[in-house]
């Protein structure tokens, strides 16, 4: 029996960037803390309704390795919102639409959000929401193994836009994969160039927080 997916009218797509260390220097049980949040409310066809982005202060220092990878400095993070304020801002953005479904590229963002909220004694602003693992679902649609976002864009013949490993840029690239993924579940060839070239354009509207 073919699986039938019913898409919500809108989905909140989120990407988180975390503090990080080189593997050789990383202590045991190290947990990268959230330092940047990117989010967008989108339709299944890839229309971006609203966008949100903020830097977040963290207890962990921003290492040189982290700055090289993310392009985020300690000064950037020091100028960000306190974690509780960032969660409040995300909660307010999340309630702008009636859907209670959010997605990310993989499960790491879900785990990171829950971990950091628990660390600060806060309830996740997305507690009780359905989480969509877009990385897993996108790979399933094409009957391939799960890959990173950048590799998925290459497979889908979609150009990477904006700096990789910046939260909002990654969100907008995930939106393209999200919009391109679902027709493949309905018997479209997994490498149909006409479909990929005819993907919906991203419509950027104002209205999200900074």
Where are these regions (language model features)?
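Metal-dependent phosphoesterase core characteristic of DEDDh/y 3'-5' exonuclease domains
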Residues: 2-4, 9, 30-37, 41-70, ...
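Short, P/G- and charge-enriched loop/turn segments at secondary-structure junctions
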Residues: 24-28
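N-terminal accessory regions of nucleic-acid-interacting proteins
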Residues: 1-16, 21
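Conserved protein kinase catalytic core
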Residues: 21-23, 139
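Metal-dependent phosphoesterase signature
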Residues: 68-88
């Amino acid at each position: 029996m073919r699986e039938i997916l019913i898409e919500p009218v809108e989905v909140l797509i989120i990407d988180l960037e975390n503090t990080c260390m080189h593997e050789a220097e990383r202590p045991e049980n190290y947990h990268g803390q959230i330092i940047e949040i990117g989010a967008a409310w989108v339709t299944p066809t890839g229309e971006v309704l609203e966008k949100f982005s903020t830097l977040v202060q963290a207890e962990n220092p921003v290492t040189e390795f982290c700055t090289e990878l993310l392009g985020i400095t300690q000064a950037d993070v020091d100028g960000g919102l306190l974690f509780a304020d960032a969660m409040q801002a995300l909660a307010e953005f999340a309630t702008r639409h009636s859907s209670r479904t959010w997605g990310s590229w993989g499960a790491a963002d879900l785990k990171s959000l829950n971990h950091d909220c628990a660390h600060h004694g806060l309830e996740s602003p997305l507690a009780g929401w359905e989480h969509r693992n877009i990385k897993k679902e996108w790979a399933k649609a094409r009957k391939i193994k799960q890959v990173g976002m950048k590799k998925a864009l290459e497979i889908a013949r979609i150009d990477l836009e904006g700096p990789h490993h910046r939260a909002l840029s990654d969100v907008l690239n995930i939106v393209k994969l999200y919009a391109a993924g679902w027709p493949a579940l309905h018997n479209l060839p997994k490498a149909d160039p006409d479909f990929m070239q005819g993907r919906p354009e991203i419509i950027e509207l104002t209205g999200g927080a900074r």
